[in-house]
Curated annotation (Swiss-Prot):
Biochemical pathway: Metabolic intermediate biosynthesis; acetyl-CoA biosynthesis; acetyl-CoA from acetate: step 1/2
EC number, as in UniProt: 2.7.2.1
Species whose genome carries this gene: Bacillus cereus (strain ATCC 14579 / DSM 31 / CCUG 7414 / JCM 2152 / NBRC 15305 / NCIMB 9373 / NCTC 2599 / NRRL B-3711)
Gene from which the chain derives: ackA
Protein name: Acetate kinase
Organism phylogeny: Bacteria, Bacillati, Bacillota, Bacilli, Bacillales
Sequence similarity: Belongs to the acetokinase family.
Length: 397
């Protein structure tokens, strides 16, 4: 048995989960928020109880030291020698990484170089890796990339209709994201269906504040809705999703904003927040719609219609699907959104059961037994996928 810690480092946060492997038992999990501020928040679960502490955590190195101290103080590990491996979520692996990889100096340099493609995420991921290297230099560490699962996409899916040299010189292409989540739920769907994943065509709908759809054929991603960045695809909480690229200079001209300012609007002030004017949270928007708010209704209609576009095109691409999977915050917990997405899909063999659909955050088949296309709710577990890859690549006994 080995203890493996899964890490997701953000610019001012550090999310962690400690597993006993290979049993995949969660020993503890927690979150460090507001790193760099005087009122940082450290939360850890001990024996099922959440412990919360507000203190000054100036940087990620201090956060890591505090985390490791808490593990020993609370008896979760007797000593740090029990930690056999560390798994780091890294947002962007470019074309360089089609799988998770053991972190070396060369790999770390490559991840830093890829920061051009993910300036909001990769630098924070690197900070997290370095912080652990300082404290646990001899413990194997593995990088698990959000983009890796989608590296199986064919050129017809990942190339943009731009001058080919842009791809050759600058790496401009579709990369896709949420790969670890899409991989987990499609593998789990195959288990639940009792069929080899190689025989299945699956649609994975990762619907949260960020959202993406993936077409997975034979266990391999063949297309996905996010693109060069996580801004592309369906309408999201605060992100616009796909739009006419000529809108960017037009908005700049009309508003006097810079490129950076417009891109910031597209990332942080658009999507459901932009359409409603008051919230990115679908729970708030559904409540407002029930009160008769027109913009809430329109926003929800836009959200669902964009998902329909991908379901239709990916079903055509795979010549039919065996199952549609719902995962992430909205996908796992919103029966209303699932119902609206599935309504009217009988033409493609979807027959969902409204009673079975009344589930929240748990695995369930929500289609009728006779439905040719199965509908499955599967809570995602990116952390356990990270731990599995550490076990696979870290040579951990």
């Amino acid at each position: 048995m080995s203890k493996i810690i899964a890490i997701n480092a953000g610019s001012s946060s550090l999310k962690f989960q400690l597993f006993e492997m290979p049993s995949e038992t969660v020993l503890t999990k927690g979150l460090v928020e507001r790193i760099g501020l005087e009122d940082s928040i450290f939360t850890i679960t001990v024996d099922g109880e959440k412990q919360k502490e507000i203190t000054n955590i100036p940087d990620h190195a201090v956060a890591v030291n505090m985390l490791l101290k808490k593990l020993t103080e609370n008896g979760i590990v007797k000593s740090l020698d029990e930690i056999g491996g560390i798994g780091h979520r890294v947002v962007h692996g470019g074309e360089k990484f089609a799988d998770s990889v053991l972190i070396t100096d060369e790999v770390l340099a490559d991840i830093e170089e890829l920061s051009d493609l993910a300036p909001l995420h990769n630098p924070a991921n690197v900070v997290g890796i370095k912080a652990f290297q300082e404290v646990l230099p001899n413990v194997p560490a593995v990088a698990v990339f959000d983009t890796a699962f989608h590296q199986t996409m064919p050129e017809s899916a990942f190339l943009y209709s731009l001058p080919y040299e842009y791809y050759e010189k600058f790496g401009i292409r579709k990369y896709g994201f949420h790969g670890t989540s899409h991989k987990y739920v499609t593998e789990r769907a195959a288990e639940l269906l009792g069929r080899p994943i190689e025989s299945l065509s699956l649609l994975s709908c990762h619907l949260g504040n960020g959202a993406s759809i993936a077409a997975v054929e034979g266990g391999k991603s063949i297309d996905t809705s996010m693109g060069f960045t996580p801004l592309a695809g369906v309408t999201m909480g605060t992100r616009s999703g796909n739009l006419d690229p000529a809108l960017i200079p037009y908005i700049m001209e009309k508003t006097g904003q810079t490129v950076e300012e417009v891109v910031n609007v597209l990332n942080k002030k658009s999507g459901m927040l932009g359409l409603t004017g008051y919230s990115s949270d679908l729970r708030d928007i559904i409540a407002k719609e029930e009160e008769g708010d027109h913009r809430a209704k329109v926003a929800l209609d836009v959200f669902v219609s964009r998902i329909h576009k991908y379901i239709g095109s990916y079903t055509a691409r795979m010549k039919g699907v065996d199952a549609i999977i719902f995962t992430a915050g909205v996908g796992e917990n919103s029966a209303i959104i699932r119902e609206r997405v599935l309504e009217g899909l009988e033409y493609m063999g979807v027959y969902f059961d409204a009673k079975r659909n009344n589930v929240f955050g748990e695995e369930a088949f929500i289609s009728f037994p006779h439905s040719p296309v199965k509908i499955i709710v599967i809570p995602t577990d990116e952390e356990v996928m990270i731990a599995r890859d550490v076990l696979r690549l870290g040579d951990i006994g």
